[in-house]
Amino acid sequence: MNVINFIYSIFDKKLFKCGTISSRGLFYNDLNFFHFEIYFLLALITFLIFFVILSNKKNYRSYYYLNVGGIFSNLLPFVVILLLIILNTNTNDSYYLFAGFYYNDAAVVFFKNIILIGFLIFTFAIKQYLSYFKYYDFEFILVLFISLFSSLLILNSNDLISLFFIIELQSLTFYILVASKQTSSFSTESGLKYFILGCFSSGIILFGISLIYGFTGLLSYTDLTLFLSEVYVTNFILDSSFFSFSGFLIGFLLLTVGFLFKLGSAPFHMWMPDVYEGSPLLITAYLSTLPKISLIFVIFKLYYYVFFEVFLFSQGLFTLTALFSILLGSIAAIYQVKLKRMLTYSMITNTGYLLLGLSFGDISGIYITIFYLISYIFIMIGLFFCFLSLRDRSSGLLVKRINLFSNLLEVNPSLSFSIFILLFSIAGIPPLLGFYSKFFLFLFSLKYKMYWMTILFVIFSVVSVFYYIRLVKLMYFNRTTGWIFLYDIPFLNSLIISFITIINCLFFFNPNLLFKLIYNFSFYLYI
């Protein structure tokens, strides 16, 4: 017996649950399943070594030429593009690894593609942010890269414990990013608030997982699915022989509350306004878009697959939090005078629409939620790119108050038009992209006979249009005596803003392309 076979014989063969793994040995073909993760980690380690050895030496002659912002912002797009290429080499593989801890299929690859494409767009905003503020510390970039890795790894989780650990890794990076603006005490305060309340929500999730494990003895998604299908009988009546099922339901509801807290839905939104206002605008843009993709995927996996037999208990909670989020977000945003607080309440409103789609409980819910999620992220990235391009003339800082948008039409008509289109799109004005997402959401609500809820959602959707129109009114009809914005927008940022604006305007010519793509991947999550 050679050395490789001897080492392989030591391992329990249950470690590899998938039958597609080669029997020749641990070191022959098994690493083929981890090309994406290996390349990601190698890139992370390479950047870390380079920054620690060279970039952090301030007495080194070329430190000011080889700054972190310049080097990383130029290399990062190529790294992400290579990640996309490696990710899509084996898109049809479906397999379990490490006793079911790790899972991959076409739906996971689809969501990873969305996150990576979104992050690729963000790399150009990162370049502008670092170069303008002369931010040379490598920790910011490193933590941002780790947060991306954790967001991608969440999608492969197939066990409640591994899911919790990865969510905690992601949360730790978020705490650091929120408090990354060292010159601002407000940023430090926001990071501390986020840390305390984030730990509280993590404790709720962990307590729910412990109750689920205590009353079932299971943590694997696959095992829990089989177990619940056995104790559940027809007509939505629980098997009375499972005497401790009530304790399981408490854990299930605690897990649901923890995820709603992470999503920032009302009434679990208390942390969002202060945290998002205190964090740098780039981090606010990042936290409000890409991490939501991984959380929504986890909710799909848990509530449409693992806990589908008891989905009825969370369906009402999803509907109520959706209504409360839309109500609170629509009304509270009207009274905001600060840009980031207004956007935060807009995010809470859109989270309510996402939860409404999740409450449907079938493939239609998956389809409309994914479509709304992609539309929302696409529009919000465009809006944040516009806002990151605006700086106050007197202070040179990014715009904080909405009254500073006065007279923007005279300063930059093209940017004013882009903001106008994107605001109307997220408000749901036809025939823009955002209109289709809300239209199908309300259409499916009527299909499931949620008549009163649909009426309320439409009313508050109209109310939310007010604060978007108010911003447009400031740009187009308010006049000021001075020029507020006199800073050039980088070419790549202008290109991205123009592209997103054009797609929003031209989407209605051929919407079936995106519809069919999302509908096909919805089956992977539902079947």
Curated annotation (Swiss-Prot):
CC terms in the record's Gene Ontology section: mitochondrial inner membrane
Keywords tagged on the record: Electron transport, Membrane, Mitochondrion, Mitochondrion inner membrane, NAD, Respiratory chain, Translocase, Transmembrane, Transmembrane helix, Transport, Ubiquinone
InterPro entries found in the cross-reference section: NADH-Q_OxRdtase_suN/2, ND/Mrp_TM
Gene Ontology biological process terms, A to Z: ATP synthesis coupled electron transport
MF GO annotations: NADH dehydrogenase (ubiquinone) activity
Transmembrane segments: 33-53, 66-86, 106-126, 135-155, 160-180, 195-215, 241-261, 281-303, 317-337, 347-367, 368-388, 415-435, 452-472, 489-509
Enzyme class: translocase
Entry's localization field: Mitochondrion inner membrane
Family stated for the protein in its record: Belongs to the complex I subunit 2 family.
The protein's name: NADH-ubiquinone oxidoreductase chain 2
Organism of derivation: Acanthamoeba castellanii
